[in-house]
Amino acid sequence: MIQYKSINHQDTSLAEREEYFKNLEHKDDDSAVLLQTCNRVELYYGNGDVPDEVARHLFRVACGLESAIIGEQAVQGQIKEAYMTAKRTKKLSAGMHKLFESALQIGKRVRSETQ
């Protein structure tokens, strides 16, 4: 099952997020994507099914709904960069590919169809 760990600007300071990033652990044999922005550090990891909660969270992040400034656009590029880095350096599961491809498509669609 694909899971995620997350901390963000709403509940931690920058120093706490930096410390969290340094101490993040997961099994090296797991499929994983590390998303780090100014306001959040998230690790998506695992194989298999994607629970609705995980997909919903990443989709909200991709749409800018979880950003300090709602609708912020830079997060879309940051998600793509994290995904592409993981794709180049790790063996990603089919579920992880689908999750991130879907998030990028949804983020793009929301930005093109809303004001």
Predicted regions and their residues:
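Glycine/serine-rich phosphate-binding loop and adjoining beta1-alpha1 elements at the start
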Residues: 45, 52-115
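Histidine-centered active-site/metal-ligand motif
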Residues: 9, 38, 57
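A generic structural motif
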Residues: 39-46
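Short beta-strand
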Residues: 31-37
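Short beta-strand segments
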Residues: 6-8, 35, 78
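Short glycine-/aliphatic-rich beta-strand segments at the starts of folded cytosolic domains
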Residues: 1-21
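Short amphipathic beta-strand starts and helix->beta connectors
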Residues: 23-31
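Amphipathic alpha-helical segments at domain termini/boundaries
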Residues: 36, 50-52
